[in-house]
Curated annotation (Swiss-Prot):
Residues that hold Mg(2+) according to the record: D11, D13, D177
GO MF assignments: metal ion binding; phosphoglycolate phosphatase activity
Function: Specifically catalyzes the dephosphorylation of 2-phosphoglycolate. Is involved in the dissimilation of the intracellular 2-phosphoglycolate formed during the DNA repair of 3'-phosphoglycolate ends, a major class of DNA lesions induced by oxidative stress.
Family, per entry: Belongs to the HAD-like hydrolase superfamily. CbbY/CbbZ/Gph/YieH family.
Protein name: Phosphoglycolate phosphatase
Keywords linked to the UniProt accession: Carbohydrate metabolism, Hydrolase, Magnesium, Metal-binding
InterPro entries xrefs: HAD-like_hydrolase_sf, HAD-like_sf, HAD-SF_hydro_IA, HAD_2, HAD_sf, PGP-like_dom2, PGPase_prok
Length: 224
């Protein structure tokens, strides 16, 4: 066990789980109800990372450019609600854990690290997704988009973890795939691992200057 780090926080989408197919399906199902065009999966990928309201706002902005159709504030709320409904029904139809995630988490837990999830995903979806892959029991805390007043890139979730478990920021390692993860971690005073395979708006994660850059989740074991 690395004696510097006591707690390891993980982003969810694009870090632990490849959830893009189910997210894209849910976005397009919601858009279809309002006669809006279907977005290709590779485009939806660039909208992920700031929570459901921002995801839908980006989708509607794209749809507006395609069709010229402007939705009312009420309709925007309805699209978001329909997305949440469809995603709730399709959390793990096609989503999969990335390679080596479960095995690595089990090793880290066995080594004595406190493990936590910090995601901007709607809070009500976090535990069900983790449970579907049989890894929810490995985490001592699961923070979603509605768990606290602020979400990433604000450092509040990491401050919360430090306070709850009694650790200094230097004792916390955060692992994510997007610039929001890197910004949040560094703002909190934590070291950060950037993973290259996730959803960083098609921008190389290295450009966000994480402390380590890994291509495979199992590479975490090289520093822990």
């Amino acid at each position: 066990m690395n004696t510097q780090f006591k707690l390891i926080g993980f982003d969810l989408d694009g870090t632990l789980v490849n959830s893009l197919p189910d997210l894209a399906l849910s976005v397009n199902s919601a858009l279809a109800e309002f006669n809006l065009p279907q977005a290709p999966e590779e485009l939806v990928l660039t909208w992920i990372g700031n929570g459901a309201p921002v995801l839908i706002a980006r989708a509607l902005d794209w749809a507006k450019k395609q069709t010229g159709k402007v939705l009312t504030e009420t309709e925007v709320k309805q699209v978001t609600e329909r997305f949440n409904f469809y995603y709730g029904e399709n959390l793990c139809n096609v989503s999969r854990l990335y390679p080596n995630v479960k095995e690595t988490l089990e090793i880290l837990k066995e080594k004595g690290y406190v493990l936590a999830v910090v995601t901007n995903k709607p809070t009500r979806h976090v535990q069900p997704v983790l449970a579907a892959f049989g890894i929810d029991h490995l985490f001592s805390e699961m923070l979603g988009g509605q768990s606290l007043p602020a979400i990433k890139p604000h450092p509040a979730p990491l401050y919360y973890l430090c306070g709850k478990f009694g650790f200094e920021p230097r004792q916390v390692l955060f692992v994510g795939d997007s610039k929001n993860d890197i910004i949040a971690g560094h703002a909190a005073g934590c070291a950060v691992v950037g993973l290259t395979y996730g959803y960083n708006y098609n921008i190389p994660i290295r450009e966000s200057n994480p402390d380590w850059v890994f291509d495979d989740f199992a590479q975490l074991l090289s520093i822990l």
